[in-house]
Each structure stands twice: as structure tokens, then as C-alpha cells.
């Protein structure tokens, strides 16, 4: 019987040059798996806790405490367990930690080991990670939610909304869809350069021009779609990540759009979204309101929920109990899936199953601080998420996921690509 023989971690760097945890699990048959944990910039209040050292190293962002927890507390309890019982491995770490948000061990320590265990198990069986996690049912290639213009916390410009994305919804396969958005990205660079604006990129590879309003990036993207020879609405759709929790004034409870020098109530912001959706082929809005503004989310869902995918990121933080509450109250209709928000592979899978049972779409997602680790590419296919959010075709930490998806698609051969289908039920 194969068992976990050794576990260790070390401190490596993410795409922003900040330290993060790399965990390695070695099995008794000699196979091993490693995983690098991502980190977010715009984070929800109820996310699992990322353990940082808080000393002088790396401006306080070192992760040696988390590394030590892997090498001692976690390793001591997991060595001898079966790597093929992911639920037991993850539950054991949760028991060791003893808190609801992994504040003792650190979610970055726990997730690294959880992911590395899954990878080691797949390697031991000599099957791809997506096949190990998803079985024979893993057959859906995700539609990319492709970051093309950055604002908010992800860029140093005057645009308030955090991400403007395009989605290749009018194509029959992943490869053609990826080609289309990659070509549009190159044309957008030319459009922005012609405008005399910077073509510097943000954390996730999208451009970060200093535009005049929150609507202007959409019109600029529409121009790039046309110049690339594609049809907006028919082949290419638009998605927004507002990250509204970063915009709200906690005292006035109004949303501050600094780039436009105005403040809006929840209802006014919903009307603003409705106006944008009437002008442009917007199919998805993420975190359109603050994570605490559930009354506002109710207004948003009632007004746009039948027409647009309304995604909860900070709202749900990949937490099954919070998603269940949202389902009960009729809030949003989709869940962004970030494994490091909840802490383990098993808990992430639980949240996805709950969402899918209740007809909520799932979008597998990276974080703004990433690495060469492409675990989420396999994870998205394994659980038939149907959508993935993993940046643009710039920065190798984002490209790693797309290249892995191309590899997976070639291996599967018969893979499905849902295109517009995730949005047709809205």
C-alpha cells in the first residue's frame, strides 16, 4: 500500500516577487508532487488566512512560519496516510489547525500540501491530474475569461473597475477561442499605443492605460475586437470584475468612483451596470457590489440576474456555507472558485459541487500573485467548471495555465467547449 513518506516546504517567489509556499509530498513508491500557492491583492474579509511572518524580511511578507508548519506540525500528522484519500488528508490538516480559517497553520501552508498530495497521487497512478481529480467525467474545456485591461487594485491608473475581460463565447473549441482573444490582445496594444497611452501591463497581464472613465475601456476593447476581425456579441463577449468591495465608503455606504469623481448608492450602481449592459455585449459581472452589501446584491440579482452572469468572489470566498446562504437568499448566480480562499482541494470541490447542484455557474480562478504552477488548469477541467479566469497572454505565470489547457485538450481529444451555453440559462 502506497503511503505518504515525507512532506516538506520551502519559500519561493510569486509573480509579484513576494514570497510564497512551495510544498512537496513524497510517497513510499518514490513518486512525488509539488505545488506553489498563489496570493491575492484584492481579498475578501472572510477568506482563509494567509500566514505571513511580519518581520523585516521581504517587508514582512516572508512565509517561513508557514514553511515551518508544513515541515513539522503537518508532516508529523500526515506521514503514513494514504495520498489517495484526499478528504482524509485535508480533514486531518483542518483538525490540526483547529480554526475556521486556518489562522494557526496558515492557509498557504495547508493548500500547498493539499495540492501537492493530489499531484503526488496522480503521479503515482501515472495519470494526469485532471483525470485523477475528475475521473472519466472530466471532459469540458473552460471558456477563458481573458483579462485585457486592468484597473483598481491591479493597476496604477485612474480606472476604478479592477478587470475588463473578453470571452471567446462564439467558438467551437478552446484552441480557436484562445487564438481569438490572443489576437485581440495584440490589436488592443496597437489601439492603446495609437491613443498615446501606456501599454504597460498590470499584475495579470492586462494593459493599464490611464483612461477617462470606467466605460472608456469597454469602447476601446470593442474597437480592438473589430480591428482583429471578430464580431462583438456574436463571437466575443465582455466580462467585468468591478471588485466593488474596494470602492465602497464604509461610512456613507456609497460606492466611490474616483476616476469619475462621483459617488453612487447600490441602486444607482446597479442602474449604471444595466446601462452598460444595454450598450455592450456584457455577459458577466463579478463582485458588482460589496461583499457586505447583500441588500444591494438582491437588487442587482433581481434586475440583471436573468440576463447576465453575476459572479460572487469576495462575496462567497469559495466557502460552501456562504454560497449556501447566497443560494437560499437568491443572491448572484455564479461563484468564482479560488482554492486559496478556502484552504484545501476537498473544500474547493465541495463548494463547486454545491454550486453546480443549484445551477450556479463556476469559474476557476487564479490570483493576482501567481507562479508557473498550472494546478488550476487541471482543476477546472476535472470539475467541468466550464470557465476559467487566468489572465492575459502576457506574463509566463498566466501563459503556463493556457499552455497546460492546450495540452489537456490535445490529450482528451473529445473535449466539450461550452461557448455561450453557460450564459444561455440566465
From Swiss-Prot:
GO terms for cellular component: cell surface; extracellular region; phosphopyruvate hydratase complex. It is found in: Cytoplasm; Secreted; Cell surface. Pathway: Carbohydrate degradation; glycolysis; pyruvate from D-glyceraldehyde 3-phosphate: step 4/5. SUPFAM superfamilies: Enolase C-terminal domain-like (SSF51604), Enolase N-terminal domain-like (SSF54826). GO terms for molecular function: magnesium ion binding; phosphopyruvate hydratase activity. Coiled coil: none annotated. It is an enzyme of class 4 (lyase). It comes from the Bacteria. Binds a second Mg(2+) ion via substrate during catalysis. Keywords: Cytoplasm, Glycolysis, Lyase, Magnesium, Metal-binding, Secreted. The active site is at 204 (proton donor), 338 (proton acceptor). Its main location: cytoplasm. InterPro entries: Enolase, Enolase-like_C_sf, Enolase-like_N, Enolase_C, Enolase_CS, Enolase_N. Mg(2+) binds at residues 241, 286, 313. One of its GO terms (biological process) is glycolytic process. Catalyzes the reversible conversion of 2-phosphoglycerate (2-PG) into phosphoenolpyruvate (PEP). It is essential for the degradation of carbohydrates via glycolysis. Belongs to the enolase family. NCBIfam families: eno (TIGR01060). This is Enolase. The gene is eno.
Amino acid at each position: 500500500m502506497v503511503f505518504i513518506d515525507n512532506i516538506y516546504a520551502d519559500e519561493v517567489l510569486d509573480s509579484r516577487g513576494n514570497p510564497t509556499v512551495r510544498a512537496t509530498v513524497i510517497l513510499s513508491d518514490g513518486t512525488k508532487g509539488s505545488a506553489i500557492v498563489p496570493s491575492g491583492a484584492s481579498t475578501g474579509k472572510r477568506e482563509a488566512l494567509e500566514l505571513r511572518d511580519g518581520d523585516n524580511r521581504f517587508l514582512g511578507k516572508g512565509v517561513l512560519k508557514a514553511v515551518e508548519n508544513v515541515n513539522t506540525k503537518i508532516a508529523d500528522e500526515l506521514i503514513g496516510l494514504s495520498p489517495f484519500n484526499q478528504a482524509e488528508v485535508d480533514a486531518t490538516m483542518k483538525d490540526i489547525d483547529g480554526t475556521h480559517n486556518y489562522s494557526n497553520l496558515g492557509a498557504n501552508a495547508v493548500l500547498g500540501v493539499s495540492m501537492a498530495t493530489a499531484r503526488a497521487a496522480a503521479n503515482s497512478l501515472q495519470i494526469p491530474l485532471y483525470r485523477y481529480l475528475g475521473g472519466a467525467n472530466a471532459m469540458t474545456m473552460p471558456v477563458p475569461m481573458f483579462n485585457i485591461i486592468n484597473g483598481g487594485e491591479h493597476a496604477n491608473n485612474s480606472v476604478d473597475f479592477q478587470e475588463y475581460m473578453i470571452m471567446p463565447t462564439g467558438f467551437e473549441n478552446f484552441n480557436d477561442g484562445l487564438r481569438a482573444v490572443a489576437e485581440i490582445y495584440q490589436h488592443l496594444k496597437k489601439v492603446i499605443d495609437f491613443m498615446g497611452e501606456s501599454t504597460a501591463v498590470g499584475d495579470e497581464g492586462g494593459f493599464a492605460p490611464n483612461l477617462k472613465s470606467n466605460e472608456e475601456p469597454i469602447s476601446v476593447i470593442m474597437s480592438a475586437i473589430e480591428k482583429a476581425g471578430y464580431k462583438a456579441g456574436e463571437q466575443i463577449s465582455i466580462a467585468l470584475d468591478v471588485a466593488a468591495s474596494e470602492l465602497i465608503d464604509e461610512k456613507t455606504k456609497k460606492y466611490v468612483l474616483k476616476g469619475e469623481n462621483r459617488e453612487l448608492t447600490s441602486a444607482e450602481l446597479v442602474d449604471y451596470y444595466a446601462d452598460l449592459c444595454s450598450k455592450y455585449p456584457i455577459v458577466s459581472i463579478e463582485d458588482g457590489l460589496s461583499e457586505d452589501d447583500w441588500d444591494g446584491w438582491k437588487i442587482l440579482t433581481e434586475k440583471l440576474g436573468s440576463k447576465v452572469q453575476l459572479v460572487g468572489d469576495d462575496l462567497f470566498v469559495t466557502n460552501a456555507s456562504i454560497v449556501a446562504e447566497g443560494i437560499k437568499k437568491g443572491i448572484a448566480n455564479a461563484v468564482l472558485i479560488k482554492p486559496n480562499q478556502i484552504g484545501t482541494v476537498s473544500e474547493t470541490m465541495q463548494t463547486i459541487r454545491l454550486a453546480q447542484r443549484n445551477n450556479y455557474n463556476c469559474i476557476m480562478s487564479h490570483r493576482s500573485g501567481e507562479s508557473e504552477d498550472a494546478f488550476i488548469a487541471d482543476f477546472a477541467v476535472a470539475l467541468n467548471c466550464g470557465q476559467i479566469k487566468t489572465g492575459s497572454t502576457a506574463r509566463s505565470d498566466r501563459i503556463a495555465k493556457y499552455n497546460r489547457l492546450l495540452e489537456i485538450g490535445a490529450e482528451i481529444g473529445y473535449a466539450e467547449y461550452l461557448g455561450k451555453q453557460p450564459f444561455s440559462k440566465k
